[in-house]
């Protein structure tokens, strides 16, 4: 567990964790010292004659030159001040624990999200989006809870060890008896409850995965659900997983309460036994053992919550262990490390002996060859599923060929230059996603807007008249997924987005297939007009959209067939 946790934490986090562990030892010493001070206070307060029998106390009384009762009063005031200091120190320590454990949510969530954004495109397409959401939100939060439990476990162990040492010094026989009795009871508790907690943790993880899957799938198919009136079926699925998730948490919370209830009951019985034992042993005079009884009462009063927290924290480690495994595996994913090498595009884009197939599947293409001259307009057509979009992903440098090469001006596309190459490409997909922000932000993807460039692409995409009539202009919110806009308006924003970075290559992946024929023809004419100096690669179903292309290739059985 520690190996995985240290892999996840940064160097600064590990250093702070070490500091917290050292600090917890200091806090434990303060806790133990605070309890140990009670014994001399009660002893002296119950019998002033100690000040006449103990040479150190005689020296103290002579040095202070005040009545004994005043010394006791000042001792009591000092004890109160020390206990206030102890309370403040504990509050500060628990603040540090919370700041570290819950603060890791931000740091680890950022690392996991960053990792998913930086894996290669092919691996990302094989991921389940609901799994990604679950990891970044639920599992990271669970891990932060697990870190909190780990730190609490360690700090309470230090407290127990030091208090145990103190009790051994006072009366080792009673302490050893108490130890055997409590360890035996704790072992029984852990043995009985651990399998239940582990099982509940696995059920929680499975239910949470299904929970996110149902949410993700059905919110993305809301129109279909409404059309087919499938609300009851969806709610039934949701209810089943929601109940399973709740039941797992109920089991965990219920079992977590058992150690406290059990140990409190046992602790009280043990305490009564100790008092009775000491009284019977000293029938004639119990004043001499009053301080011993007091120290054991206070020690047990402090040990019971510690023992409960240790068992509860251990159960939390078991319950959330699957979250640690999931985050660990996510962070071990290999990142796509792209270099900063520059490429120029003055002559041609060449596909040479290209072969590709998704991992574990047959090759879609074998030995494809194609030359695309700079400024040329080409189109790919073919049946659905023949690999047109995959081919475009390869041309855009998102997928890596299994065999063969993609060359730009005779220079092979690779990890060193892929970043610069991708920046040369403007992409307009079939399914356009606009996030719930301003038109300007949806076009530029940044807060640092180049107003001149923005104005230029708005004109090129024929959005100027539409935006001028909006009360807030380019700052108008488009709604989630562009719900406040028509299909044509969303398409034009997508065109403006593709043109904003001034690409040399423009890729249209069935970009206008959702529009009616008239709107499609109008938008395609506009795209051709503003892309005279650009290389265009178009995937199309309707042949009417590619009449102005220089070449048209049909993709069939993994091979090209030139049709124009």
Residue ranges and their predicted role:
Residues 166-180, 262-324:
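Helix-loop-helix
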Residues 20-26, 152-202, 273-288:
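Transmembrane helices of ABC transporter permease
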Residues 396:
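Helix-to-loop junction immediately C-terminal to a conserved catalytic motif
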Residues 407, 415, 422, 440-480, ...:
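ABC ATPase nucleotide-binding domain helical subdomain, centered on the C-loop/LSGGQ "ABC signature"
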Residues 21-85, 168-173, 180, 286-290:
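Transmembrane helix-loop-helix hairpins at lipid-water interfaces of multipass membrane proteins
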Residues 125-130, 205-251, 319, 324-327:
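Loop segments that connect adjacent transmembrane helices in multi-pass transporters
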Residues 211, 223-230, 254-257, 261, ...:
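Cytosolic ends of transmembrane helices, especially the final helix of ABC transmembrane type-1 domains
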Residues 500-504, 533:
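A short, proline-enriched helix->beta-strand linker immediately N-terminal to the Walker B motif
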């Amino acid at each position: 567990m520690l190996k995985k946790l240290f892999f996840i934490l940064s160097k600064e986090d590990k250093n702070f964790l070490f500091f917290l562990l050292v600090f917890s030892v200091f806090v434990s010493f303060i806790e133990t010292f605070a309890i140990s001070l009670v014994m001399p206070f009660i002893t002296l307060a119950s019998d002033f004659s100690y000040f006449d029998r103990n040479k150190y106390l005689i020296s103290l009384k002579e040095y202070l030159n005040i009545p004994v009762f005043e010394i006791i009063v000042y001792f009591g005031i000092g004890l109160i001040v020390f206990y206030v200091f102890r309370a403040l120190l504990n509050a500060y320590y628990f603040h540090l624990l919370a700041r570290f454990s819950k603060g890791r949510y931000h740091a680890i969530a950022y690392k996991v999200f960053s990792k998913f954004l930086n894996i290669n495109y092919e691996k990302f397409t094989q991921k389940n989006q609901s799994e990604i959401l679950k990891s970044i939100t639920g599992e990271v939060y669970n891990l932060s809870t697990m870190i909190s439990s780990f730190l609490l476990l360690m700090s309470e162990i230090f407290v127990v060890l030091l208090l145990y040492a103190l009790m051994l010094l006072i009366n080792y026989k009673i302490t050893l008896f108490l130890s055997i009795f409590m360890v035996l009871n704790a072992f029984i508790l852990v043995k009985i409850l651990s399998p239940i907690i582990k099982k509940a943790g696995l059920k929680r993880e499975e239910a949470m995965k299904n929970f996110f899957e149902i949410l993700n799938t059905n919110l993305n198919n809301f129109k279909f659900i409404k059309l087919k009136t499938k609300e009851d079926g969806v709610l039934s699925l949701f209810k089943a997983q929601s109940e399973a998730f709740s039941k797992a948490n109920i089991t965990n919370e219920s079992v977590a309460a058992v150690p406290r209830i059990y140990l409190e009951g046992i602790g009280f019985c043990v305490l009564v036994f100790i008092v009775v034992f000491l009284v019977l042993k000293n029938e004639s005079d119990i004043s001499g053992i009053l301080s011993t009884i007091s120290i054991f009462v206070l020690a047990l009063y402090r040990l019971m919550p510690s023992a409960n927290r240790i068992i509860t924290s251990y159960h939390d480690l078991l319950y959330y262990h699957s979250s640690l495994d999931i985050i660990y595996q996510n962070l071990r994913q290999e990142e796509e490390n792209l270099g900063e090498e520059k490429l120029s595009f003055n002559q041609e884009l060449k596909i040479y002996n290209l072969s590709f197939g998704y991992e574990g599947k047959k090759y879609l293409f074998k030995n494809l060859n194609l030359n695309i001259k700079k400024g040329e307009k080409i189109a790919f057509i073919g049946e659905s599923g023949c690999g047109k979009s995959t081919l475009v992903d390869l041309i855009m440098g998102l997928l890596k060929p299994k065999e063969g090469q993609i060359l730009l001006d005779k220079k092979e596309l690779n990890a060193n230059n892929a970043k610069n190459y991708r920046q040369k490409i403007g992409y307009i997909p079939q399914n356009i996603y606009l996030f719930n922000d301003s038109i300007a932000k949806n076009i530029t993807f940044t807060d640092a807007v180049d107003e001149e460039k923005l104005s230029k692409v708005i004109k090129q995409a024929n959005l100027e008249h539409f935006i001028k009539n909006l009360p807030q202009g380019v700052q108008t919110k488009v709604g989630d997924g562009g719900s406040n806009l028509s299909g044509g308006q969303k398409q034009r924003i997508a065109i403006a987005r593709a043109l904003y970075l001034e690409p040399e290559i423009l890729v249209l992946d069935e970009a206008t297939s959702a529009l009616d024929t008239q709107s499609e023809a109008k938008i395609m004419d506009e795209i051709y007009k503003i892309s005279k100096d650009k290389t265009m690669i178009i995937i199309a179903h309707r042949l009417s959209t590619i009449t102005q292309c220089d070449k048209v290739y049909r993709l069939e059985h993994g091979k090209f067939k030139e049709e124009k």
